[in-house]
């Protein structure tokens, strides 16, 4: 399995685990800027990062959309464990309470947006 396939699979597992632990609705809620919702309909973007990377990526246009909807981020740090993952830390943060973001250009054709990196220690 390729590295990006593993990252995608691990990210999906992290989303599921956060939804279970926080009581979030995931099914049928996924968009480019929202992975789940609180039961009251408030959107949540889930950011999962493998402990070895040390950061998450946030895209400016998706962050702006989440802010417009008064949404939240669910941050997850995990490590691979067998065929799954072990969640090491998780935290919910309102989209207005992120650490200062420094936007940089990206050549990602599909995203067409600037990105910022958020180090794990800035959230935990």
What is each of the regions a protein language model found here?
Residues 1-124:
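Nucleic-acid endonuclease domains
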């Amino acid at each position: 399995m390729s590295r990006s396939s593993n990252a995608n699979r691990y990210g999906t597992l992290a989303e599921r685990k956060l939804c279970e632990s926080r009581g979030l609705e995931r099914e049928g809620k996924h968009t480019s800027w929202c992975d789940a919702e609180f039961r009251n309909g408030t959107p949540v973007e889930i950011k999962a990062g493998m402990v070895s990377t040390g950061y998450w990526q946030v895209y400016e246009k998706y962050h702006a959309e989440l802010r417009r909807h008064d949404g939240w981020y669910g941050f997850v740090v995990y490590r691979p464990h067998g065929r799954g993952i072990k969640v090491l830390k998780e935290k919910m943060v309102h989209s207005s309470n992120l650490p200062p973001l420094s936007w940089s250009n990206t050549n990602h054709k599909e995203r067409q947006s600037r990105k910022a990196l958020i180090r794990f220690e800035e959230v935990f």
